[in-house]
Curated annotation (Swiss-Prot):
Cofactor stoichiometry and binding remark: Binds 1 NAD(+) per subunit.
Location(s), subcellular: Cytoplasm
Gene that produces this protein: ahcY
Binding residues annotated for NAD(+), in chain numbering: 193-195, 227, 256-261, 279, 314, 335-337, 380
Example of a GO biological process term: S-adenosylmethionine cycle
Catalytic activity: S-adenosyl-L-homocysteine + H2O = L-homocysteine + adenosine
Protein name (database record): Adenosylhomocysteinase
Family: Belongs to the adenosylhomocysteinase family.
Enzyme class: hydrolase
Known role: May play a key role in the regulation of the intracellular concentration of adenosylhomocysteine.
Pathway assigned in UniProt: Amino-acid biosynthesis; L-homocysteine biosynthesis; L-homocysteine from S-adenosyl-L-homocysteine: step 1/1
EC number: 3.13.2.1
CC annotations in GO: cytosol
Matches recorded under NCBIfam families: ahcY, PRK05476.2-3
UniProt source species: Sinorhizobium medicae (strain WSM419) (Ensifer medicae)
Length: 466
């Protein structure tokens, strides 16, 4: 990167390729294109300086350019070291938006890039965060706490945390007061995924959330579509691209049966696999059983199953003793946000053979091997290209509306976690119906009055579960 280039990408020469794919994606993302049409003239995000930490894909490129069309300035990094699509990053960088994302970047580079998305060329600060997993938010909040004298940058729990702490210390030494200045300028954060939302709720419970947050993940048009239908298509895509293994007839174990687990089980079942599910929640376990899946304990199937997928958002779901007991050439992968669902760190002292990018063969002393996808990180983005554009349009439309809401009406919100109102959820769904040729039935005024709603919606009470 030359001195006048405010970006880091793998190859800026891929920009034309990326631009062609962005043009195709735009035709599959009616929600985002409708946001441009509705808000492009008024530019409600004029003055917004958005720091974005979210998978740098073709679909994200359409999101970024929508934010820019609505008046925002944007700086962007990926939220995963393997999820960047280099041609997408190149196209966005070539358009003039600072982006710092390379597929296969190191953890050191990852946290350096996270730091860079808060460094504006004129020395100014961000006033909004668009996050996926919470890393950008946590980077600023941990740094500000350290500046305040809290002794929190000790005893890292993982290699990544050690690298994160080192990056924070580096910034603390270089620019005292920087983190506090950044934190105090933030009007709000919009969070994309379950893991990041959990972090925000934990901060709220402890009284440590310093600005309002919108939980985009729990918008119905995100969690019930992206998490379920997106995984339904992208999980098997990632396994196939990574391994070329036929799934029909194989035994696949899905750990977790939340929305992501439901989509993952359906994905594998649709490919002909015989799916078993592990669960800690009796409600989700009962759902899995009544959906026709055998609900098991991992220990009972670990030596007989062929494919293992974690979807829980928790840590140490598949541990070293489980992998040691697996049959030769079992496939192990994760579609939850972080890499600690599988105890990858416990595998590091074993023999690794890299087959191709994001596919490793790991051999145990007794001779059995496992195929590990994307080093335990999101395999649908590491081994493939993630969810299809159409379903991401729904998720990202929620992000755009949430950014507008917090930026323009932030004074109406306390330092708590909110969800978008149901009428906006329904609006996002409505924007995607025509693309599928779907036609809504309309309530008469009499029918609407009978069930206690307005004829144009919202059609469900806030407590309704879809």
């Amino acid at each position: 990167m030359s001195a006048n280039q405010d970006y880091i990408v793998a190859d800026i020469g891929l920009a034309d390729f990326g631009r062609k794919e962005i043009a195709i994606a735009e035709t599959e993302m009616p929600g985002l294109m409708a946001c441009r049409e509705e808000f492009g003239a008024s530019k409600p995000l004029k003055g917004a300086r958005i720091t974005g930490s979210l998978h740098m894909t073709i679909q994200t490129a359409v999101l970024i350019e929508t934010l820019v069309a609505l008046g925002a300035e944007v700086r962007w990094a990926s939220c995963n070291i393997f999820s960047t699509q280099d041609h997408a990053a190149a196209a966005i960088a070539a358009s003039g938006v600072p982006v710092f994302a390379v597929k296969g970047e190191t953890l050191e580079e990852y946290w350096t890039y996270t730091d860079k998305i808060f460094q504006w060329a004129d020395g100014g600060v961000s006033n909004m965060i668009l996050d996926d997993g919470g890393d950008a938010t946590m980077y600023i909040l941990l740094g500000a706490r350290a500046e305040a004298g809290e002794n929190i940058l000790i005893n890292p729990g993982s290699e990544e945390e050690e690298i994160l702490f080192a990056q924070i210390k580096k910034r603390l030494a270089a620019t005292p007061g920087w983190f506090t200045k950044q934190r105090d300028a933030i009007k709000g954060v919009t969070e994309e995924t379950t893991t990041g939302v959990n972090r925000l709720y934990q901060l709220q419970a402890k009284g440590l959330l310093p600005f309002p947050a919108i939980n985009v993940n729990d918008s119905v048009t995100k969690s019930k579509f992206d998490n379920k239908y997106g995984c339904k298509e992208s999980l098997v895509d990632g396994i196939r691209r990574g391994t070329d293994v036929m799934m029909a007839g194989k035994v696949a174990v899905v750990c977790g049966y939340g929305d992501v687990g439901k989509g993952s089980a359906a994905s594998l079942s649709g490919a002909g696999a015989r799916v078993k599910v592990t669960e800690v929640d009796p409600i989700c376990a009962l759902q899995a059983a009544m959906d026709g899946y055998e609900v098991v304990q991992l220990e009972d199937v670990v030596s007989s199953a062929d494919i293992f997928i974690t979807t829980t958002g928790n840590k140490d779901v598949i541990r070293i003793e489980h992998m040691r007991a697996m049959k030769d050439m079992a496939i192990v992968g994760n579609i939850g946000h972080f890499d600690n669902e599988i105890q990858v760190s416990a595998l590091r002292n074993l023999k690794w053979t890299n087959v191709k990018p994001q596919v490793d063969l790991i051999e145990f002393p007794k001779g059995n091997r496992i195929i590990l996808l994307s080093e335990g990180r999101l395999l649908n983005l590491g081994n493939a290209t993630g969810h299809p554009s159409f379903v991401m349009s729904a998720s990202f439309s929620n992000q755009v509306l949430a950014q507008i809401e917090l930026f323009t009406k932030g004074e109406n919100y306390k330092n708590e976690v909110y969800v978008l109102p149901k009428q906006l959820d329904e609006k996002v769904a409505r924007l995607h119906l025509a693309k599928l040729g779907a036609k809504l039935t309309e309530l008469s005024e009499e029918q609407a009055a009978y069930i206690g709603v307005k004829a144009q919606g919202p059609f469900k009470a806030e407590h309704y579960r879809y």
